[in-house]
């Protein structure tokens, strides 16, 4: 075990959740929803903190004006024809390397969900061949990465042919830029204990940087893009937009795939625009942003989160549900982090534990509308799941919200008492307070698949995949927000906890936390090879981390959502890709 991983919490099990859902199957309907307007308000004056969050940068009229022509039937007909042609191309490509490159392009272009069966059948055949991946580094690394990403138990022994007796990479590979880039991308699918892949990452980074100045423009851009963030860590929808642009400028572009990717991107974007309009109306009608002006009004940015986590068209309900969840969660987070007194926060936490509408009368005025919004949302999700699948998930997701609010209260008590927790103690609480577990449990039920008992049991007893992805999300969040929160005097987050604990500088502390993120990815990669959850859901969990790395890559992309976050919203949701290239 590395020194880095020892800084993470040491338990291997997640704290227990409520009884298995089978005990609640086909039970009575949730309580009817209550209208927020029924609540009577009583003002309570208390000195309040403020984070001075800027208001929403998105004009509701602009959101309502979004209208893409790509949802029209004529484009749907063309899309189906292109899918058929691409499927024929997959079937007709016999040469192994050409087929692997085709699959890699299909994935990067964001259209692999159309060809899941064909890709699986082909990879089954590749895996059956064993370690015979060809004699060049590029092919071997590409094959290894694709198999790992799809959950095949391939080992790094495939790289032995490129090693000297001393287990170092042969000198001749140091000049193969294309092979080094492929090796670099493959190394990020590593799990703990795979030293050859650790060496591969260091070796490829060193020599790619050395070769950079002598590379042709197209390859140099690819290397720079990869070294900024590896493919395995990138938000898929954002990578698809980038890769469509790169292919549009390439002399080697495949016109069938390129047109398919362009049209599919714009078609899916048209669906995303309609969803954004729907949840924007819901948010305005809910009234939380207007009533609770101290909180972050980030509906559009929250929808970007949802697009990053579950981008495919079939997950429309999941995206809308996650946007609602994140929006309500953000307000509650700001109540605990900034606005509420400790006495008020204890009342709110107790009300969530009771989960009784009568608890409303124990709350101060401003908390009532927030409690009702949460109450109604959870009952809506529970009712829809019971109606469609016969499972009463209310006790299950209630428990997740209770754990979340309890973790918020712990952080509020740390702040109120001036406590500065050690990094281990902070992360034991922080993996919950980041909202990962509550979001991923909701996502499972919102994705519209028949609910499997074995998956329920897996979630119920604690998912290591959800745990490590939540730790990684927390660490990425803290890397992006630490400067602003330290300046504001908030409770110490991961970077500051490590600085206080060790006396290290801010830069060294950030480097350590980045190392923890890398270790989390190794654990997630390992869990992906052995967990029993549906593959599409596993990707959803990984996408939470990928989206967090996108949102917090250049700072607090939610607290301050101008700049990079605004540009990414426009790029992914508002502006279609060009219909033709020079």
Curated annotation (Swiss-Prot):
Its EC number is 4.2.3.106. Expressed in male and female leaves. Barely detectable in fruits and shoots. Mg(2+) 3 binds at residues 477, 481, 485. GO terms for biological process: diterpenoid biosynthetic process; green leaf volatile biosynthetic process; monoterpene biosynthetic process. Mg(2+) 2 binds at residues 333, 337. InterPro entries: Isoprenoid_synthase_dom_sf, Terpene_cyclase-like_1_C, Terpene_cyclase_plant_C1, Terpene_synth_N, Terpene_synth_N_sf, Terpene_synthase-like, Terpene_synthase_metal-bd, Terpenoid_cyclase/PrenylTrfase. GO terms for cellular component: chloroplast. CDD domains: Terpene_cyclase_plant_C1. Pathway: Secondary metabolite biosynthesis; terpenoid biosynthesis. Keywords: Chloroplast, Lyase, Magnesium, Metal-binding, Plastid, Transit peptide. Its main location: plastid. It holds the Pfam family Terpene_synth. (2E)-geranyl diphosphate binds at residues 296, 333, 337, 474, 477. Residues 1-35 form a transit peptide. The keyword Chloroplast applies. It catalyses: (2E)-geranyl diphosphate = (E)-beta-ocimene + diphosphate. A motif (DDXXD motif) lies at residues 333-337. Binds 3 Mg(2+) or Mn(2+) ions per subunit. Its cofactor is Mg(2+); Mn(2+). Mg(2+) 1 binds at residues 333, 337. GO terms for molecular function: (E)-beta-ocimene synthase activity; magnesium ion binding; terpene synthase activity. Belongs to the terpene synthase family. Tpsb subfamily. Monoterpene synthase (TPS) involved in the biosynthesis of monoterpene natural products used by traditional Chinese medicine to treat headache, inflammation and intoxication. Catalyzes the conversion of (2E)-geranyl diphosphate (GPP) into (E)-beta-ocimene. The Asp-Asp-Xaa-Xaa-Asp/Glu (DDXXD/E) motif is important for the catalytic activity, presumably through binding to Mg(2+). Monomer. This is Trans-ocimene synthase, chloroplastic. It comes from Litsea cubeba (Aromatic litsea). The gene is TPS1.
């Amino acid at each position: 075990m590395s020194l880095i991983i020892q800084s993470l919490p040491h338990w291997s099990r997640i704290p227990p959740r409520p009884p298995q859902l089978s005990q609640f199957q086909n039970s009575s309907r949730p309580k009817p929803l209550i209208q927020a307007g029924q609540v009577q308000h009583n003002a309570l004056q208390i000195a309040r903190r403020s984070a001075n969050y800027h208001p929403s940068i998105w004009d509701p009229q602009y959101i309502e004006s979004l209208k893409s022509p790509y949802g029209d039937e004529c484009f749907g007909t063309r899309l189906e024809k292109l899918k058929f042609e691409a499927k024929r191309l997959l079937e007709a490509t016999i040469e192994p390397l050409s087929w692997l490159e085709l699959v890699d392009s299909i994935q990067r272009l964001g259209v692999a969900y159309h060809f899941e069966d064909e890709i699986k059948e082909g990879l089954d055949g590749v895996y059956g061949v064993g370690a015979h991946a060809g004699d060049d580094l590029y092919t071997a690394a590409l094959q290894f990465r694709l198999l790992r990403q799809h959950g095949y138990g391939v080992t790094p022994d495939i790289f032995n042919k490129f090693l000297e007796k001393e287990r170092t990479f042969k000198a001749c590979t140091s000049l193969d830029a294309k092979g080094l880039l492929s090796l670099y991308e493959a190394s990020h699918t590593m799990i703990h204990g795979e030293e050859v892949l650790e060496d591969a990452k260091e070796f490829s980074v060193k020599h790619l940087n050395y070769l950079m100045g002598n590379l042709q423009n197209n390859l140099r851009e690819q290397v720079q893009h990869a070294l900024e963030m590896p493919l395995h860590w990138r938000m898929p929808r954002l990578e698809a937009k980038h890769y469509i642009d790169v292919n549009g400028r390439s002399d080697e572009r495949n016109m069938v795939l390129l047109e398919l990717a362009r049209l599919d991107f714009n078609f899916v974007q048209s669906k995303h625009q309609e969803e954004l309009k729907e949840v924007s109306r819901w948010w305005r009608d809910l009234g939380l942003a207007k009533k609770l002006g101290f909180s972050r009004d980030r509906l559009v940015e929250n929808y970007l989160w949802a697009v990053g986590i579950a981008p495919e068209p079939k997950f429309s309900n999941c995206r809308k549900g996650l946007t609602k969840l994140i929006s309500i969660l953000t307000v509650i987070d700001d109540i605990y982090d900034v606005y509420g007194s400790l006495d008020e926060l204890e009342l709110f936490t107790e009300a969530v534990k009771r989960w009784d509408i009568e608890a409303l009368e124990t709350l101060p005025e401003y908390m009532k509308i927030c409690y009702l919004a949460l109450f109604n949302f959870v009952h809506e999700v529970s009712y829809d799941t019971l109606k469609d699948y016969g499972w009463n998930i209310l006790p299950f997701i209630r428990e997740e919200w209770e754990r979340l609010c309890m973790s918020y209260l712990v952080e509020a008590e740390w702040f109120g008492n001036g406590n500065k927790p050690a990094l281990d103690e902070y992360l034991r609480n922080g993996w919950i307070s980041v909202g990962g577990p509550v979001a991923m449990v909701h996502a499972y039920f919102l994705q519209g698949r028949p609910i499997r008992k074995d998956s329920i049991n897996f979630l119920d007893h604690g998912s290591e995949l959800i745990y490590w992805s939540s730790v990684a999300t927390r660490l990425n969040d803290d890397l992006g927000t630490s400067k602003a929160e330290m300046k504001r005097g908030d409770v110490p987050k991961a970077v500051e906890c490590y600085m206080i604990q060790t006396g290290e500088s801010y830069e060294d502390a950030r480097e350590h936390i980045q190392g923890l993120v890398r270790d989390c990815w190794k654990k997630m990669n390992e869990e992906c090879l052995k967990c029993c959850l549906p593959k599409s859901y596993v990707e959803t969990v990984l996408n939470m981390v990928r989206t967090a790395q996108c949102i917090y890559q250049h700072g607090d992309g939610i607290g301050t959502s101008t700049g990079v976050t605004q540009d990414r919203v426009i790029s992914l949701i508002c502006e279609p890709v060009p219909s033709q290239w020079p």
